[in-house]
Amino acid sequence: MSLTAKDKDTVRAFWAKASGKAAEIGSDALSRMLVVYPQTKTYFSHWKDLSPGSEPVKKHGKSVMGGVADAVMKIEDLNAGLLNLSELHAFTLRVDPANFKILSHNILVVMAIMFPKDFTPEVHVAMDKFLAALSRALAEKYR
């Protein structure tokens, strides 16, 4: 499922609205992932507090959404644009790439909750395709 020019424009336009709340989106999405998919906690066992909204969760959620913001800027070539992040996750952090899809789903849920009027079906499909493409780009170095 590739991103069309219209999808890319939709992602950019929605991100322009959502980016002001990126840290909140990231914190809530990561919190949800850790609760709903407790197996993902294994990657964060070095944190003292894994509870929803804790400082480590907020900090990493903000970092995740910084990566999403970077991906929006590099939407024309996500594989090349996210090469360093792909290498980090594959070789250093050794995150199972299946978790990218899990976190992407939670990001979509939070965006839909936080922006109910803006999260139209068109935005939903464009953001879903974008986050899937971002996940594939992050998984690129696993091959």
Swiss-Prot record:
One of its GO terms (cellular component) is blood microparticle. Heme b binds at H89. The modification N-acetylserine is found at S2. Residues 2-143 form the Globin domain. Pfam families: Globin. The keyword Ligase does not apply. This is Hemoglobin subunit alpha-1. It comes from Anarhichas minor. The lineage of its organism: Eukaryota, Metazoa, Chordata, Craniata, Vertebrata.
